[in-house]
């Protein structure tokens, strides 16, 4: 199996859902690093030089395109609106909660690119879980 190692990024035009108001456009960059094959990151520009980044499972985003997924700080689910199909992304933290709408076609295009770099099920070919577990338990390689 051939695995690419370059970062995969995409710019997404999200909409922040504002209760009782019009949605607010938010620029975001979604990123996938094949060296960390189970995760994706999404960075929200909050100011000229500030980015708030969230990292969560690639599988969560993939599942959420088709059906509601997640039961913690990150939840993803499909929805429809007059402009077409979207993916909703709910993020919760002690400092607040945000609900974003993402164009489904853009999310699917990004996911396809990640799966061409590291196919579904190929994540364990990149990460040696035994070595990672040994590092957590003993602070070094297996003994």
Curated annotation (Swiss-Prot):
<keyword id="KW-0132">Cell division</keyword>
<dbReference type="GO" id="GO:0090529">
    <property type="term" value="P:cell septum assembly"/>
</dbReference>
<dbReference type="GO" id="GO:0030448">
    <property type="term" value="P:hyphal growth"/>
</dbReference>
<comment type="function">
    <text>Involved in sporulation-specific cell division. Required for early stages of sporulation. Important in the process of growth cessation prior to sporulation-specific cell division. Recruits cell division protein FtsZ to the future septum sites and tethers the contractile ring structure (Z ring) to the cytoplasmic membrane during sporulation. Stimulates polymerization and filament length of FtsZ in vitro.</text>
</comment>
<comment type="subunit">
    <text>Interacts with SsgA. Interacts with FtsZ (via N-terminus).</text>
</comment>
<keyword id="KW-0749">Sporulation</keyword>
<dbReference type="GO" id="GO:0000917">
    <property type="term" value="P:division septum assembly"/>
</dbReference>
<dbReference type="GO" id="GO:0043936">
    <property type="term" value="P:asexual sporulation resulting in formation of a cellular spore"/>
</dbReference>
<dbReference type="Pfam" id="PF04686">
    <property type="entry name" value="SsgA"/>
</dbReference>
<dbReference type="GO" id="GO:1990586">
    <property type="term" value="C:divisome complex"/>
</dbReference>
<protein>
    <recommendedName>
        <fullName>Sporulation-specific cell division protein SsgB</fullName>
    </recommendedName>
</protein>
<dbReference type="GO" id="GO:0051301">
    <property type="term" value="P:cell division"/>
</dbReference>
<dbReference type="GO" id="GO:0051781">
    <property type="term" value="P:positive regulation of cell division"/>
</dbReference>
<dbReference type="InterPro" id="IPR006776">
    <property type="entry name" value="SsgB"/>
</dbReference>
<dbReference type="GO" id="GO:0031160">
    <property type="term" value="C:spore wall"/>
</dbReference>
<dbReference type="GO" id="GO:0030428">
    <property type="term" value="C:cell septum"/>
</dbReference>
<keyword id="KW-0131">Cell cycle</keyword>
<comment type="similarity">
    <text>Belongs to the SsgA family.</text>
</comment>
<keyword id="KW-0717">Septation</keyword>
<dbReference type="InterPro" id="IPR038658">
    <property type="entry name" value="SsgB_sf"/>
</dbReference>
<dbReference type="GO" id="GO:0042244">
    <property type="term" value="P:spore wall assembly"/>
</dbReference>
């Amino acid at each position: 199996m051939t695995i690419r190692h370059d970062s995969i990024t995409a710019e997404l035009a999200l909409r922040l859902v504002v209760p009782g108001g019009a949605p607010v456009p938010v620029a975001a960059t979604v990123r996938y690093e094949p060296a960390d094959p189970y995760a994706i990151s999404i960075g929200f520009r909050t100011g000229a030089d500030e980015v708030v980044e969230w990292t969560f499972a690639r599988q969560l985003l993939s599942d959420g395109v088709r059906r509601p997924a997640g039961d913690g700080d990150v939840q993803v689910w499909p929805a429809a609106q007059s402009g077409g199909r979207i993916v909703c992304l709910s993020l919760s933290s002690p400092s607040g909660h945000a609900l974003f709408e993402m164009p489904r076609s853009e999310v699917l295009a990004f996911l396809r690119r990640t799966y061409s770099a590291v196919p579904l099920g190929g994540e364990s070919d990149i990460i040696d879980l035994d070595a990672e577990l040994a590092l957590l338990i003993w602070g070094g390689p297996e003994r």
